[in-house]
Every structure is written in C-alpha cells, then in structure tokens.
C-alpha cells in the first residue's frame, strides 16, 4: 500500500508539473495583439462610449437632470456599458486551471456573456434611438412673449405683389428681458424690393453669431426675418441642447428697430450690418418668397431647431443657394456663423469698393464701417 501511495503521489506531482508546464507553454504561445487589433478595439470602445453619451444627453435634455427616470436610465446604461467593456479583461487562461475542459468552459462563458451584453446594450440603444426620433415638435407650449406669435401672410387677389403680413414684431425694448409688446400687421409691395442686408450679431465670441436678413424697399422701411429657437417661459439657450430636440424652430418677421435694437442696445451684443451686392432683383424677390414658404411650412407643421443642421445661418444659406441657382459654393463658414461675412466677401457678395472713390475695402474695413 505504501508503494501504491508513493506511486500515486508521484503521478499527482508529475501531473501538476505537466499542467504548470502546459500553462507556461500556452502563455508563451499567446500572440500579442497587433496594432490593427488594438486600433479596432479602441474604435469599438470609443463608439460604445460616444453612443452611450449621446443617448444619456438626449435623456438628460428631455427629462431634466433631477428626473428619477433620468437617473434610472443613467444607472442602467452605464452599468451595461461597464460590464460590456470589462469582458475584455476576462481571463482565458490562468495557472489555476484544473483541466482543459474547464478552460473551454471558461472561454465559452466569456463569449456568451459578451454576446448577451452586446445584445442587451444594442436593444437598449435602438429603443432609445426610436424614442428620440418619435419626439414631435409642438405649437402649443407656454412660449416667451417675443416668440409666442407666428408670422402669416395673405397675398392680394388682384395684385400678387402686395403681401399683407400678420404678427410682425415691433417691440419697444427697455431691458434685455422687458419690452412693451406690439404685434403689427404690415403690407409690403414685392415690386419695390431694392436689396438685402445681412446682419451678424456676436453674442458668444468671434466664432458664433446670430444671423438676420433684412429686405430693403424703394419707398418703405426695411423688414427683417430671423430664424430663432422658440423658447418657452424661463428657458435659456444651450448650443449643446440644440442637438437633442430641445427647441422648436421659429421664424420671426420684425421691424429693424426691434430685432436689431434688442441685440445692439438691450443685450449689448456686437452687431454688424452688411449690404449684399451682386444680387438680381428676381433673386431678391425669390429669397423673400422663400421666407414666405418657410412661414407656411412652420405654420402647417412645427419643426425642430438643430445647432448644426437647421440654425439661424445655414437655413438662410440653403434658401439663398436655391434661389441663386447653386451659385453659392459650400464652405465650412456656413456652420461657423461668426465667419459668414468673410465668406460673403470671398464669394463677391460684399462690394470690394463700395465708396465712390473706388478705394477697395478689406474685410477689416468692412467690420469697422458696418458696426452698429
């Protein structure tokens, strides 16, 4: 019996030594990930993190940070994502493995968990995506006074050049927030259109500006149009929130004494007015008609403001490009609204020599001369 016990211990010792040797051999044979594999892993991790961040921001801006639903969704999404990312560090081979079968079981367990977590996260994210795109803009919220009316119009049956606009804003501003409200009705004659001015109002540094378009008339005062967010009572603007269906889009028709004064005086913004050159009369009229069409569209069906795709500047560019027969080239400055005047200068929409002495103006001179 002593001999059998000795033999058994010898075999056990030999087995352990062989297992250790096998583990060491597997470790040595384990290939190191290539730079391509590392890059793919990195891109997958970044994609997961960005997709989760997008969904969380959408929930936060729709329901508010203090909402219980926001926090429950945050905990669930972060938990699933953390568990999914942690599977990368699951041990596939360890020195404490007792057999090859257990090693295979370990590997299968990791793969199963990874697939399960990917399925759960993908389902949650797709449900969130569907929820986000199902959010509809509304017309019947508690709006701030400056955007609570929608411009509409009627065309004279006998003279189609005569347009009667209803709800033209003509406020008397005392402070940035206080004003005496006036919503006027005004009739204009499209045959008397004489030109276009573009106003840039800088409120957040040199890169970001609010853009307005004013139409000049031969025998009447200008009329301005402005695409803006339709703020609710107590609401403030956030560029980041503008990506997440937080604000409806509003088109304001206003007198310049209202819509420019409130920015240059009441709010203390830096405002510049640029007269546009090289536009034919039919192009000016077509651009005005585009605003009327936009008013019809927004009255029929509200739309979302988007910081990148449908803001105060690029909507104007989309319309202007159509009426000019695609004469205006695409440019990154369409999305960097503070540099829009430089774009207009480069494409010849600002007169290079606006004075009678024909002395050319640089862009710096334009900024100096057009500051309000």
Model-derived features: where do they sit?
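Intrinsic-disorder-associated, low-complexity terminal segments enriched in Asp/Asn/His/Tyr and depleted
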Residues: 7, 18-20, 100, 104
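Membrane-embedded alpha-helical segments of integral membrane proteins
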Residues: 39-90
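Internal/C-terminal transmembrane anchor helices
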Residues: 110-135
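Alpha-helical transmembrane signal-anchor/signal-peptide segments
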Residues: 136-152
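Glycine-rich catalytic cores of cysteine/serine-nucleophile enzymes that process amide/ester linkages
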Residues: 163, 174-271
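Active-site nucleophile-His-acid catalytic modules used for acyl/amide transfer and hydrolysis
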Residues: 254-335
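A cross-kingdom marker for long, charged
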Residues: 337-372
